[in-house]
Design a protein with these regions (language model features):
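Active-site-adjacent beta->alpha loops and helix N-cap segments on the catalytic face
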Residues: 38-40, 60-76, 91-95, 115-133, ...
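Glycine-rich beta-strand-to-loop/alpha-helix junction loops that act as flexible
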Residues: 198-204, 222-226
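Conserved N-terminal beta1-alpha1 strand-loop-helix module at the mouth
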Residues: 3-101, 105, 150-157
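Glycine-rich phosphate-binding active-site loops on the catalytic face of alpha/beta enzymes
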Residues: 31, 85-86, 106-120, 162-175, ...
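Short beta-strand/loop segments at the ligand-binding rim of alpha/beta enzyme cores
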Residues: 23-26, 74-88, 134-144, 191-201
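Short beta-strand segments at enzyme active-site cores
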Residues: 58-63, 67, 79-81, 109-114, ...
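Short, surface-exposed connector motifs at secondary-structure boundaries
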Residues: 49-55, 111, 133-139, 192-195, ...
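C-terminal helical cap(s) of enzyme catalytic domains, especially alpha/beta-barrels
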Residues: 178-179, 185, 227-254, 259-264, ...
Length: 270
């Protein structure tokens, strides 16, 4: 067997091992942003430890530093991304090849990136990074974050390993959405589950919603804000109890969009 063939075999074997470990499981998104009241490296690591204690099958984490620290503390498969915000583009999830390289070098098992039709800072549709990344880091597993069926179809054809409607509710076309698109996701699963690992991510706030996603064909489910962001959990309660006068979804969306860049070395330890 040639060296290239061996590498391909190793990737397929590693890929299957990782995906098997995530199958039918909960992936907890453990992320902190500079505007979060709980913003500290210590907190994000403890979130990941708590997720493992609770039975999570994997972790989704943001930024090389946070990925690195979580990998030191928790031995679960890790989906890594790098949120980089731009004043001229809505693409912020691992928007460049360099960002993807940093995620990979930090120890992520899977690289997540925006694969929507949104235009990136370079003036290209975000999804065009996918084939570039597959060529430049061929051993990496790639999680394509999309917002609709057509985007999912495209990334499956381009060879994404994992696909999820992560950005449903975060694009200009879907920004006012409050509920998961279970019907659209079910269609994705019916059409693409034999070609990619289908992950339900986005607007899952209860265990019952997660079970629905599995029933509809999800291979795994990602939950973030409903588990790991106490200020947003509180905001949802106060909004609902206050007669829906204070839009909790808007607060959630604004908490991750268009934040000013900040150096990770400025992150407090506790």
């Amino acid at each position: 067997m040639s060296g290239l063939s061996e590498r391909r075999w190793d990737k397929e074997e590693r890929k299957q091992k990782i995906l098997d470990s995530l199958k039918n499981g909960l992936i907890v998104s453990c992320q902190i942003q500079p505007t979060d009241p709980v913003y500290s490296m210590d907190f994000v690591v403890k979130m990941a430890k708590a997720a493992k204690w609770g039975g999570a099958a994997g972790i989704r984490a943001n930024s090389p530093d946070q990925i690195r620290e979580i990998k030191k503390a928790v031995d679960l498969p890790l989906i890594g991304l790098y949120k980089i915000f731009s004043p001229v583009s809505d693409v912020f999830i691992t928007p460049t090849l360099e960002a993807a390289r940093q995620v990979w070098e930090a120890g992520a098992d899977i690289i997540a990136l925006d694969c929507t039709d949104q235009i990136n800072e370079a003036g290209q549709p975000a999804w065009k990074l996918l084939p570039v990344l597959k060529k430049e880091i061929p051993e990496a597993l790639i999680f394509a974050d999309v917002s609709n069926y057509d985007e999912a179809k495209r990334v499956v054809e381009l060879g994404a390993d994992l696909v999820g409607p992560t950005l449903y509710g975060y694009t200009e076309q879907t920004k006012d959405i409050e509920q998961p698109d279970l019907r659209g996701f079910a269609r994705m699963c019916r059409d693409f589950s034999d070609q990619a690992f289908m992950v339900m991510e986005g607007h899952i706030y209860t265990p019952e919603d997660a079970v629905k996603a599995l029933y509809l064909g999800a291979d795994a489910v990602v939950v973030g804000s409903a588990i790991t962001r106490p200020h947003l959990i509180t905001k949802r309660f106060t909004d609902l109890m206050g007669g829906l006068q204070d839009n909790w979804r808007k607060a959630e969306r604004e908490s991750i969009n268009h934040l000013p860049p900040r150096n990770e070395e400025d992150l407090p330890e506790d």
